[in-house]
Each structure stands twice: as C-alpha cells, then as structure tokens.
Amino acid sequence: MNTQTTLLQASRWKPWEPVLWLLAFAAPLVLPSHALIINEIAIVALFAVSLDLVLGYTGIVSLGHAAFFGMGAYSAALFAKHIHPDPLVGMVFAVGTSTVLGALCSLTVMRGTDLTRLMVTLGIGLILMELANKLDWLTGGADGLQGVMMGPVLGQFEFDLYGRTAAFYSLTVLLLCFLLARRFVHSPLGGTLKAIDKAVRYAKEMV
C-alpha cells in the first residue's frame, strides 16, 4: 500500500461525521432563540480547527494564535465600514491580511525552539492586543469598533438581531475551512509535516 492510498483512506469520512454536521446546521432551526450562541460556538470552533492544524498536526506551539484571529476580525470590520459591506469580499480580505501577518511573523517564529516560539508568539499576541487598545481612532479601543454594517450574504440573506443568518454563515465558513484543513492534513505535504513532527518527538525521546 503506497502513501497516496493510505492518505486517501485516512481522508474518508466516518459514518457519524455527516450526521454531526447535519445536526449543527439544524440547530439554528430547531433552537432559533439560541442562534446567536450557535454563531459564537461556530466562531470558536473555527479558531480551534486552525489551532489544531498548527499544534496538533505540525507540532508548532503558539500562544499568540488569537492575534491572527483578531487581525482577520478587525480587517473584515474595517473593510465593511470604509470600503464595501459585502461579507464574502470582507472575508477574503481578512484572510489576506492574516496571511500576510502570519508570513511576517514566521520569519521570527520558525527560527527558534519550542520555548522561543512560546515567548515570541506570546509577545506578538500581546503587542497586537495593546495596539488594538491604543489605536482607538482605528479600532475603537476598549469600546470596540462602532458603526459596522454588514451587507446581505449573496445579496439575499440579511443579518438580523436574531442571529439566524449569522449562525448559518459561520457554520458554512466553519465547514469549508474544516474541509480545507482536512484535505491539507491528508495531502502529501500534510503527511510530510506530520512525519517531521513525529521524527522530532522520537529524537527527543532518544536523547
């Protein structure tokens, strides 16, 4: 059995996985009064998926993961406020800014050991948090960004106070990002990263 066959078998869905996703998407309909909470759960779950991709599969320890999450959130909000309120375009812009930030931080983070990465990522997170609080003319500071109005998704689905559209939007983004992360993990590159992580662990055990 070659490597590609092994990766393909590992990427196949378990029987219970589609059921879990169907239950997640049914939740805003079954529990409409809790749609806002479901939206928050989907957002935190997306954060967990991205952190698991970095820590669980590649073994890179990070204490500043929230910095990239916050960069994306502020980028999308500022884009909607000053340029265009379309949530999909804003999401693409947020992904771009977070990617640029990650690429810049990687120049420092990837040069150190685990302890160095911990301190550097923690420092990056604290610096960006302090900037978000101090640059109140841009970010709103501790009061948060005001006056952000998101347009309808695909020009059809308006965001409202009940949070149903937001819940479905966040769940859809979560599912798409989960599929991308899953595909990456079970790709040859993902297999290489996992192999490197295991090799480092075995080497530490032998010392």
Task: Place the predicted regions along the sequence by residue.
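Transmembrane alpha-helices and adjacent helix-loop boundaries
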Residues: 1-207
